[in-house]
Amino acid sequence: MVPKLFTSQICLLLLLGLMGVEGSLHARPPQFTRAQWFAIQHISLNPPRCTIAMRVINNYRWRCKNQNTFLRTTFANVVNVCGNQSIRCLHNRTLNNCHRSRFRVPLLHCDLINPGAQNISNCRYADRPGRRFYVVACDNRDPQDSPRYPVVPVHLDTTI
């Protein structure tokens, strides 16, 4: 009985440790609000090629992000989408704070093509431009955000 309990406790600790690592890979850097991090990751009127554009994000994350989408629009335009009817988020069905854009926007989707890269300076991406609708999760602004926008985008849920 004791060895089983001990083994179970070790398995639980390993599982919790892995969940913590996975969570930290998706966490925003602490110096940014959720809206600021959203803007860094997903807003660019004229993004350069993906390999260059992703360097900024990867430098904060200390690893190669598997994929990312840059919306070629302004932060203010995405904030306006937050005023659209609330819908259930498509990727996280437990959230009801998502909003779908009414218009397609130009975008650039980046896919990591060398997932085994050991150094973030070696991350390479394939560029996939497109024009799609998008769904964003929105929340009340953080105190550090500009009071100009009471509700701000905090997560790009999907593109359609």
Swiss-Prot record:
It comes from Gorilla gorilla gorilla (Western lowland gorilla). This is Eosinophil cationic protein. Its EC number is 3.1.27.-. GO terms for biological process: antimicrobial humoral immune response mediated by antimicrobial peptide; chemotaxis; defense response to Gram-negative bacterium; defense response to Gram-positive bacterium; induction of bacterial agglutination; innate immune response in mucosa. Disulfide bonds join C50-C110, C64-C123, C82-C138, C89-C98. GO terms for cellular component: extracellular space. One of its GO terms (molecular function) is RNA nuclease activity. Gene3D superfamilies: Ribonuclease A-like domain (3.10.130.10).
